[in-house]
UniProtKB/Swiss-Prot annotation:
The lineage of its organism: Bacteria, Bacillati, Bacillota, Clostridia, Eubacteriales. It comes from Clostridium perfringens (strain SM101 / Type A). Its cofactor is Zn(2+). This is Peptidase T. One of its GO terms (biological process) is peptide catabolic process. One of its GO terms (molecular function) is zinc ion binding. The keyword Cytoplasm applies.
Amino acid sequence: MKKVHERFLEYVKVDTKSDETTRVTPSTKGQLELGKILAEELKKIGVDEVRISDKGYVYACLKSNCDKDIPKIGFISHMDTAPDMSGKNVNPKIVENYDGKDIELGNGYTLSPSFSPELPMYKGQTLITTDGTTLLGADDKAGVAEIITAIEYLINHPEIKHGDIKIGFTPDEEIGEGADHFDVEGFGADFAYTLDGGRIGELEYENFNAASAKVEIIGKNVHPGSAKGKMINSILVAHEFVSMLPLNEVPEKTEGYEGFSFLLDIQGEVEKTSLSFIIRDFDKEGFKNRKERFNEIANELNKKYGEGTVTVTLKDQYMNMKEMIEPRMHIVETAEKAMKQCGIEPIKKPIRGGTDGARLSFMGLPTPNIFTGGENFHGRYEYISVNSMEKAVEVILNIIKIYAEK
């Protein structure tokens, strides 16, 4: 039987960075390649029903091995890695018996406790890091490896009784499209868990309400020598737009349950400037107010510079799954119990982001989120503890056992 970290090291070799510009699903060929690898592996270890959809989703089911009426539990992870940094030619480094000090990644980069204050808690453990040139892909190939390892353990230990266990691997989660083509009905689970969290112990059933905002500003270009009273510099209007948003409600100045507006990208010249934002808030009313503020600013600037100068396009992305999970809190409570059974103190906190589970919960599949063990996702300083990965496998198995014993 393969160890969880061995699987993980194989999966990160496949470049699965998603790309929101391609407008196809999956957005990149590497995700389909990994999906085929995973499907073949699931068949090889003895999983009963395995299929890949035309959109690259991998679905599988380990059939029940007892007559008892047990809930059908799903475990879901995503195959893509974030577009923020390259996932090509990932060259993981294994740090055995970590000494609690700086880790030289290579290529001039150092992972240090001054940057990652949590590092010393992993002293004595085996860590997997990057070489400084790519992200690692623990988000979320660690989750994929943990699920398959748990499933193989069940197959090799038929004395462990369980109901139907549903497995799902999704593409394009990192660009907000992971649930777009998920076949909830065909998946057939009563509820599920995503393995897409970070630090060991994380258990999440609240997430941001999320929207994107595209702001387009049309200016007027006139020769600068005779521009007085005529020119409208769209770049400066864009600056004005940003300055009218709450200046302290940005990612780098917020935490916990605080929301924000995040300017992701700006492209511009005098005649036309485009701004791309994301809007996040845990509170439904606060979320509504943030979106309304974008339209209010556009109206104010259009009064100042002329109708049609500023156009705002808002698009909801996902909503806070809390309202869908709370009526079924046994799902969260079971995960808590499963963690405590293997010596982990659950860390319940809101997700300052989203997971496939957020949208799936509103599609009729309540899906809280469990840790994978990774840290510093989406960049060159990403790393994961092998011990945390092994504990995630234990938690999956404990959840399955608890429901089988009820």
